[in-house]
Amino acid sequence: MLAVTACGGGSEQGSGSGDGKGKDSTAARSTQSEARVTIAPRDGAKSVETSGELKVTAARGKLTEVVVKNAKGKAVEGAISKDGASWTPSTHLAASTAYTVHAVAEDAEGRTTTQDSRFTTLTPKETFIGHFTPEDGSTVGVGMPFSLNFTRGITKPDDVEKAIRITTVPAVEVEGHWFGNDRLDFRPRTYWKAGTKVTVELNLDGVEGRDGVYGEQSKKVSFTIGRSQISVVDAKKHTMKVIRDGKVIKKIKVTTGAPGYETWNGKMVISEKLTVTRMNGETVGYGGEYDIKDVPHAMRLSTSGTFIHGNYWGGDAFGNRNASHGCVGLRDVKGG
């Protein structure tokens, strides 16, 4: 009886104590989320690649928030997948930069869990930049592209092009075109509309342009499209029409490339203006055929040496015959 009583008394106390622990444990389980968050790279990682390594995933739940920032508070753009299972960045990361990651996930019962992490991206041994035109704050013509000349040949053009964002007011579709592996131009399919405001964001810092070679530019450039002025040269008729805002305002007699030195066809943009310059045939593969030290009013049309320029030595060629080595010549006087 004593034994039974003792057992009975112990069971009741234990039962009371046991129920208490059971309730506490159940309560804890009811508030703790079953969702689990995993962040890659690991917390504290260093020399992390700027592309491909950052990813956040959730198990037994869905991600509801992911914020990745650098030390200055600038957020990394990214998106949570439709099923809530993962988050990936939509762009590369900057090089030599410390980042923090804050992620939140919830389970089927709506209970949340959070995970925080830090890491630092790699410091490149080799880098590249893009020299660009037009300059920030400039006003340019309706045919002017935004042109980048890179200091290293680019073997990952899609990644580099993706890192350049162009916005315009009014909105217009702008396309990129590569010339070889070191030049990239952006322009609309037709001429710009006069008055268009163009903003270019160069987010090249950290983008891998070729194996082991990373961009180092992070810059914003803005320029404005001025009035519409287009000059149309007819090499057969030896004339040039100047069209401003859709109206012909002037017709000029010209001379273009002689037989064997024909002027290139197509649309070309004036990219440089020189009051006076020297033109030497040696620089374009024409040997000693000419060396004119004071060519007036020279305007560059191509990187290969095609210009439209003043000409004081052409005699009666203007409007009558083509006599140049490929340039478009207009009657001018010595010294401009």
Language-model features, listed with the residues they occupy:
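Acidic, low-complexity Ser/Thr/Gly/Pro-rich repeat segments typical of extracellular/periplasmic
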Residues: 1-227, 254
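Short, solvent-exposed loop/turn elements at domain surfaces
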Residues: 65-67, 157-159, 240-242, 263, ...
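Post-signal peptide N-terminal regions of Sec-secreted extracellular proteins
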Residues: 120-129, 142-143, 258-261, 265, ...
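Exported/periplasmic cell-wall-interacting domains
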Residues: 142, 265, 281-336
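Short beta-strands and strand-coil junctions in structured, solvent-facing domains, enriched
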Residues: 154-157, 208-210, 239, 260, ...
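Extracellular/periplasmic catalytic domains that process cell-envelope and extracellular macromolecules
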Residues: 177-179, 193, 223-225, 232-235, ...
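A structural motif detector for short, solvent-exposed N-terminal "entry" segments of globular domains
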Residues: 219-260
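Active-site-proximal beta-strand/loop segments in catalytic clefts of secreted hydrolases
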Residues: 235-236, 243-245, 254-257, 271-274, ...
